[in-house]
Amino acid sequence: VDRYNELMMNYSDETADEGAKLQDMIDSQNLWDLENQVEMAMDALRCPPGDSAVTGLSGGERRRVALCKLLLSQPDLLLLDEPTNHLDAETIAWLEKHLRDYPGAVMMITHDRYFLDNVTGWILELDRGRGIPYEGNYSAYLQAKAKRMQQEAREDASRQKAISREQEWIASSPKARQTKSKARIRRYDELVEAAENRRPGDAQIVIPVAERLGRVVIEAENLTKSYGDRVLIENLTFKLPPGGIVGVIGPNGAGKTTLFRMITGQEQPDSGSVTVGETVHLGYVD
């Protein structure tokens, strides 16, 4: 766009062809209002100011900047992995509308059921090595899957009855292995194989007994953390008791991830201290 404006300010016959090509490209990609689109997207996704240093951004802010850049590039196929992570309710509402109006194809992985309901037109379920498509949103998928599971249960019951009959025939018939009976035996083998394929695998998670916790679990005293002039946490003091379950809430960029990173030792506070009890073993997913 800047190059086109430059050519128009210094228009000549020599630059006419280049100007025409640029105009066609700008028209096809709807770039005339690009700057306004960028501002609107950054505001909707609550991105930090455009001149902010990336090194000073929180994890949530970096993710929103990356999402903003991806959406504005408008690829033919948009692949999104948990797009609602680090987004608040208003931002998710904007993203839902943006994706419903998106000119290309969108494929996403998400555990946000409400987001799936409001955006998707197809659901692809991966089940025991198969991909099963369903037309409709998540609610429609649940209804269709329930019907499919009922049908599969009827088919499984019918298959088991057929297997039982064939087992009785094989055991009782002295002529079961004659040439004319081999086709029936093959059919029996096929039924058994189909039943094995339908049988879900067993999964087991073993959680060992934890050591006894001491009096100190996690304690913070006068914890302070800043990035440049931006203060995220100031003089924070708390004690987490044994067995306590705490939800950390706050707007994007408030310092939630930074607090966790200080607890796990991935970042150090500017002042104050975090103490993790000697008997405490931390487990986390970043």
Curated annotation (Swiss-Prot):
MF terms in GO: ATP binding; ATP hydrolysis activity
Encoding gene, per UniProt annotation: chvD
Domain ABC transporter stretches: 21-85
Pfam families, A to Z: ABC_tran (PF00005), ABC_tran_Xtn (PF12848)
Keywords annotated in UniProt: ATP-binding, Crown gall tumor, Nucleotide-binding, Transport
UniProt KW Transport keyword: yes
Name this protein carries in UniProt: ATP-binding protein ChvD
Membership in a protein family: Belongs to the ABC transporter superfamily.
Keyword match Ubl conjugation: no
Any Gene Ontology biological process: negative regulation of translational elongation
Entries under InterPro entries matching the protein: ABC_tran_Xtn (IPR032781), ABC_transporter-like_ATP-bd (IPR003439), EttA (IPR022374), P-loop_NTPase (IPR027417)
